[in-house]
Each structure stands twice: as structure tokens, then as C-alpha cells.
Swiss-Prot record:
Organism: Dictyostelium discoideum
Pfam short name (any one): Coiled
Protein name (record): UPF0512 protein S
Recorded family membership: Belongs to the UPF0512 family.
Domain of life: Eukaryota
Length: 94
């Protein structure tokens, strides 16, 4: 049983990042496809349900590829047909 049943999808609808970061029930996935507009499903069927209001997504910066350290990424999260957009963040290595 996955802990992400209430999330139906994560998409990169702004296409601002050529290397899409997808989050699945298998962990952080780097999809290298310039034309990727796919939906990543958490429950295996893209039919999330429930009414969870707080979702925490933690990304360990130390495990991101070096090329991702200076990439600006926009992520839209769809929760029960409601879209929530994260703020745009640029991460730079030190």
C-alpha cells in the first residue's frame, strides 16, 4: 500500500525544465526527454482519492545530479483535480 494514494499526478506543464524530475512510488526519477509531458502516477492507476490536505515532498539535494544544481524547475501538483504550483527555485552548488 503506497502512502501517495491521495495524489493523482505530478506534471511539468510549464515545460521550463528540459530534464523532467518525476516522483513515483519508486523514488526520484530523472526523465531525459525534451518533449516529455507525461503524468507520473502514485497509485498505479492515476485515480487518486482521499482528502489529505498536507503533502510533504522532501528531495535530498546531495543526491541530485550536478547538472540539476543550476536548473530552474517548476512543478505543478494535481490533488483531487485541484492544481497547486510550487514556487520556482534555482539551486546552485557551493
Amino acid at each position: 500500500m503506497t502512502i501517495f494514494n491521495s495524489i493523482s499526478s505530478i506534471t511539468n506543464s510549464t515545460h521550463s525544465n528540459r530534464s523532467l524530475i518525476a516522483i513515483s512510488n519508486q523514488g526520484l526519477v530523472n526523465v531525459n526527454n525534451n518533449n516529455n509531458n507525461s503524468i507520473t502516477c502514485f497509485d498505479g492507476g492515476c485515480c487518486g482519492s482521499g482528502n489529505t490536505n498536507i503533502i510533504n515532498i522532501d528531495i535530498d539535494i546531495d543526491k541530485l545530479p550536478t547538472s540539476m544544481m543550476t536548473t530552474t524547475t517548476n512543478i505543478d501538483i494535481k490533488i483531487n483535480n485541484i492544481y497547486v504550483s510550487t514556487s520556482t527555485t534555482t539551486i546552485k552548488s557551493t
